[in-house]
Each structure stands twice: as C-alpha cells, then as structure tokens.
Amino acid sequence: MRTVGVEEELLLVDPETGEPKALSTAVLARAEQVDPDQDVFEKELHGQMLEFATHPQTDMAALGAEIVRCRKEAARHAGEAGCAVAALATSPLPVSPSIAMNRRYQWMAEQYGIAMQEQLTCGCHVHVAVESDEEGVAVVDRIRPWLPVLVALSANSPFWQGRDSSYESYRSRVWGRWPSAGPTELFGSPERYHRQVADMVATGVILDDGMVYFDARLSHRYPTVEIRVADVCLHPDTAQLIATLARGLVESAARDWRAGREPEDHSVSLLRLAAWQAARAGLSGELLHPVTMRRLRAESVVRALLEHVGDALADAGDLDLAHEAVAELLERGNGARVQRELLERTGSLRDTVTECVRQTQG
C-alpha cells in the first residue's frame, strides 16, 4: 500500500478583524516551547503563513485524523501567539504581505520582485510514495490531464485583496506567475526528467531544484511524487479526499505504465487551458474532460475521475470513502462556494474569515 503525506499552508489572521497577521515566528516559538524537537510546523514564504506536514500514512482515516489534529494544534499555538489559523488559499481581506526573510527568500525577493511580494497563497501538497524514479516519472507523465480536476475540487480562493476575483481558485492563477510553475510535457524517462531539471537550474532563473514548481514532480526530499495543484481546503474532509484521489491517480498511472499503456499526449498548451478552466469554474460550471479536452459539466468530469481511479480506490479500501466525500462536496460546494455564500449571508468579508476560522477545525 502506498503511503501518503500531506503538507498544508494555513493563513494566520487576527481573530477579531480577520486580517492576516505576520506572526509565524511567534507561533513557531510556541510550538517549540511545547516540543523542542517538533518537526510538524515550519515557516513559509510570508510571515502570515504557517505550514504543517503530516506523517506518511497508508490508512486514509488515520491521515484525515492527523490533518484535523495538526490544524487544532496550529490553532492552539496561534491562539497563544495572538492570532488564529484559517484554511484559506488567499486572504479575502486586503493585505500587505510580509516576507519571512532568510537568505533564500531574500534571493527570491530580489529576483522576482512584485510576483514574490504578492505570493501570499496557501496550497495543499500531497506526497504519494513511488518505488523508483522510473515509476515516478511514468506517473508524472500519466496524471497530467487529471490534475485540473483536483484544482476544481479543492478550489478555495475566490477573493483577492478585498474583491471577488471571479475565479474559484485564484490562488492557482497567482501561483502560475512563478517561471517554473505549471504543467509539463511528457518526459518518458527519469534521465530526461532530471536533465530538464538540471537545465532549468543552470539558467540561473531559479535557485535550485526545490524551485522547480511543476504541477507534479519527483520530490527532491522523499521517494514520492508530489502533487502540488490543490488549494488548501477549507474543510479537513476535503483535504482527505484530495489525498485519497491523489493516491488513486498515482496507483492507476503506475498500473497503466506497467501494463504498457501510453499516456495521453496532450500539449502543455491544452493542459494550461484545462487548468485555467478549472480555476475559473471550479465545480460550478464546466471543466475540460481529461481525455477529450472538451467542455463538460463539472460533476460529469468528477465522475469520470472516480471511474478512472475506481479500481485503485477499491483495492485500497477507499472507494466508498471517495464516493461519499465527493457526493458531500458536490452538495455542499467547495471552499470557494462556501466563502461566497458566507459573504452573501453576512455582507462582511471580516465575518466570512472569522467563520472560516471556525470551519477550519472540522
């Protein structure tokens, strides 16, 4: 059974006003007072963000429970530092991001200017174990067209600087400003993958292989494929669903590779259009079907994803969990829909944020 780990980035906000607060250093200090050897929480690009990482899990119920536990611990440490945590992929309220300055981030600030300054976005990264780089590259090649569906399911960033962006996942559009971000062409072999990464680093435009921000990549730290397209999800059960589907995609792709089935050869241009459509429409409109690359009702494309990974989900014991979670998500709506409904009901972005703080805990 493949292990799965999740990394989530959370927004630190004022519990009264909902405005982001640059208190990550204070929050981490509280976490380290409790456990000097803690390795769960760490700083991110901006001081208004906090990241946590789960341990690798094979059981999805255990992974979901750990996500909830980490969020609650983050909330406790944040409360002691004078702020709250919100699983929001962008700040609904206007904010001037505060870059957490170390040598790496200083280099990035000088290199990328306003694109770096405005990159106050919170994502969810899923690591799924692979047996080798050869299997990993085969997986990366085969999951490419399905990743926009994860964008739509996780979409949780409708607001930007106090305005409705008209997108369901505006975070993914902001993230796309990085020069190395986005979908990839077919690699075909680990040699070609590693050669491309080395060539990208050699340009000097990016600092190292950690800044190769492919939608899915071989992790440079773990024996995993890292899927990097999702917004941080408002509700923990949605994060668990994204991880479940990610493992299903990886396992299905590995099986296709071993069976000699070739990957879809969609161009990067088409994949970018699919990603844009998913960010714009989320679950409320139409998506591009991963095989035909033609518009289809979002629910139908989500059902196609479930069918595509169905055997892998069943073999892992995750089929019922995935179907139930998808049904609930389609009924309730993704985070973007929830945020917009909160604003419509309360008339206040501040109240929207404070309610999202509550819902972050599950």
UniProtKB/Swiss-Prot annotation:
Keywords: ATP-binding, Ligase, Nucleotide-binding. Its EC number is 6.3.2.2. It catalyses: L-cysteine + L-glutamate + ATP = gamma-L-glutamyl-L-cysteine + ADP + phosphate + H(+). One of its GO terms (biological process) is modified amino acid biosynthetic process. InterPro entries: GCL_type2/YbdK_subfam, GCS2, Gln_synth/guanido_kin_cat_dom, YbdK. One of its GO terms (molecular function) is glutamate-cysteine ligase activity. Pfam families: GCS2. It is an enzyme of class 6 (ligase). ATP-dependent carboxylate-amine ligase which exhibits weak glutamate--cysteine ligase activity. Belongs to the glutamate--cysteine ligase type 2 family. YbdK subfamily. This is Putative glutamate--cysteine ligase 2-1. It comes from Streptomyces avermitilis (strain ATCC 31267 / DSM 46492 / JCM 5070 / NBRC 14893 / NCIMB 12804 / NRRL 8165 / MA-4680).
